[in-house]
Amino acid sequence: MRDLVRGYAAAVLDGAGPDTGRIVSELGSFGAALVHFDALRQVLTDATVAPASRRAVVVDLLGGRDSARTVALLGFTAHYEHASELAPSVAALVGLAEQVAAAPGADLVEPPAGRSAARERLRGYADRVFEELDDAAVDRVGDEMFALSRLLDRTESLRHVLADTDVPYRARAAVLEDLLAGRAAPATLRLARYVLRNGRTRDLVGTFEWLVELAARERGMRLAEVRSAVELDTAELARLATALGRLVARRVTVRVVVDPTVVGGLLVSVGDLVIDGTVRLRLERLRDVLALSS
């Protein structure tokens, strides 16, 4: 099973509650249909059929009969799983759902993973969470993830506790819940909990910053990180977003990191584009000139 699909499945099953047993049954029935119905198997495992078309076949076949969660999960799997691996992937989904059904109310902790695999799982999980939100709610998640990344960046003790896999997951999740409960949206807490149980906590700050970027992409926007010695007001942020949007030909959402070391001016990053208009840079260049002339 692709890590992307596994992450999406984890998000679907997290919110299933008493419907998990039904999902297990429906996944099993679909897996059996792939075995017994040649025409269905041929269409869904044909790599020349467009992924969106494979997804549409699943949705048309199951919509109105199976639960909405099952339809979403199997449609996503048909779209993103390698066509030749669809049947084994569905079988793996049955096993995953059975694990969740056997431990109701418990979060399924993922096995350890490398950076790429962990990011793919998290992207799949976030895809499902964002599907359930409107644009304003996605914006709020992005804001809260950014605030959390800044808090972790400046609070080493908190970062260490949350990243320490020798501490049981439930204890670390409790710390996170105490921190966010009543302050953050349920979707933010849900994503943050998955980060802790996703098999890789080595770079929590970078991971939460990446989620901010995913939230921006979900709205068809680019993320701009701006480092400034002082906070920017609403009007300044709006002007900056407009100017950067013209530059990259996309709508831009701006997140500001207050960094006194820039002295003055701004350091702007939009993907690979970096614009350094800081006083710090000008001072460094002046020092270089003075060093050469002495």
Question: Language model features by range: what are they?
Answer:
Residues M1-S294:
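Elongated, mostly alpha-helical coiled-coil "stalk/stator" tethers of large membrane protein machines
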